[in-house]
Amino acid sequence: MPTFSRVSTGVEGLDEILNFLQMGDNVVMQVDDIEAYKSFVLPYVRTALAAHRRVVYMRFSHHEALLKNTGQITVYKLNANAGFESFSTQVHNIIRQEGRDVFYVFDCLSDLLLAWATDLMVGNFFVITCPYLFELNTVAYFALLRGRHSFKTVARIRDTTQVLLDVYNYQDKVCVHPLK
């Protein structure tokens, strides 16, 4: 079970809004583009590494890599085109192998639509993966591209995750609206 110790996002203002993250949190960001997601991923990873945490990057998308495979970051390259069951099994095996207290970054979940051609499976993947990450006391970042998913899929993800953030630009400023 999670220990609920406080964890920084690496962004001071976001830490204030959320009163920090806790071990066990899964954080989903609804964004307009990958760059918006990356702007939150990089400080999260820097802060985790500075605290001597293990960082694992689950790479499965066609977008530019969010993180580079340095000696400090473990990168797993996964094949989403192998199908939902194979992909989910790969991810769960990695999570089990990595163990507790790991800080994860996942590529954008919306890109799984390209491989699986169904929104339902994206929601299913999240619903079976998020509780497993929670059990192992991890912190994990995920992204969804705004407007790419059905209301039902977003609702299932919202119901499962611990933190859901709507990230958008307004008058050349990045705004974050916590939805959960």
Where are these regions (language model features)?
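Glycine-rich P-loop/Walker A and Walker A-like loops and their local beta1-loop-alpha1 context
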Residues: R6-H62
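Conserved catalytic network of the ASCE P-loop NTPase/AAA+ motor domain
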Residues: N19-Q22, T47-A51, I95-E98, P131-L136, ...
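Hydrophobic/aromatic beta-strand patches that form the interior of the parallel beta-sheet core
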Residues: V27, V56-M58, T74-Y76, Y141, ...
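Structural motif
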Residues: V28, F103-D107, Y141
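Short, charged/polar "capping" segments at the starts of alpha-helices
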Residues: Y37, H63-K68, H149-F151
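Conserved inter-motif catalytic segment of the P-loop NTP-binding fold
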Residues: A51-L114
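Substrate-engagement module of ASCE P-loop NTPases
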Residues: A115-W116, M121-R148
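Phosphate-binding/switch region of NTP-binding enzymes
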Residues: T138, L144-K180
